[in-house]
Regions:
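Terminal leader/tail segments of proteins
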Residues: 1-138
C-alpha cells in the first residue's frame, strides 16, 4: 500500500485512491502516526517509512461523546480518544467548530458533538472555551 495515495476528505472519511477506507482499526493505526512537516504538510510515519498524505480540511473528526468517571471523552472517526480533563479553546471557521488535539484547530467537531459540548461553553470576549465539569476556569 502506497500511503501517499491516502486522502482524508473534508467530511472526515479516509480514502485510498477512490476507495473509502472503512476498517476503523486500520484507520486508528494510521491516524495515531500522523505528523506534520516543517511546512505544515501532513504525513504518516511508520518506523522509517514516511509518506505524505492529502488532508482536505483537518485530519481528525470528533464524532462520539461519552461521560465517564474521569470526565468527558470524545471519540474520533478513527477511534482515537480525547479525555476532556482540561479546558479547550473552540475555534470557529465560518460556522464549522474545531478544537485542538495535536495541533491548533486540527479536529472538527460533528454538529451533534458541538451541541452536546455547548453546555460547557465559557464566553470570554470574542473567544469561546469548552470548560468541562470539575475543571477550573482559566
Amino acid at each position: 500500500m502506497d500511503l501517499k495515495d491516502i486522502t482524508i476528505k473534508a467530511d472526515g472519511k479516509w480514502y485510498y485512491g477512490n476507495a473509502e477506507m472503512f476498517r476503523r482499526n486500520i484507520l486508528n493505526i494510521l491516524a495515531s502516526h500522523i505528523e506534520r512537516d516543517e511546512n505544515g504538510a501532513y504525513l504518516i510515519r511508520l518506523g522509517d517509512d514516511v509518506n505524505p498524505i492529502t488532508v482536505e480540511d483537518v485530519p481528525f473528526l470528533a464524532t462520539g461523546y461519552q461521560e465517564t468517571d474521569d470526565g468527558i471523552k470524545l471519540r474520533f472517526h478513527d477511534l482515537q480518544e480525547l479525555l476532556l480533563d482540561h479546558e479547550l479553546k473552540l475555534t470557529l471557521k465560518g460556522d464549522v467548530p474545531y478544537i485542538s488535539y495535536k495541533w491548533e484547530a486540527d479536529t472538527r467537531l460533528s454538529r451533534g458533538i458541538y451541541w452536546k459540548l455547548s453546555d460547557y461553553f465559557d464566553f470570554r470576549g470574542d473567544e469561546i472555551y469548552i470548560v468541562p465539569p470539575d475543571v477550573k476556569k482559566g
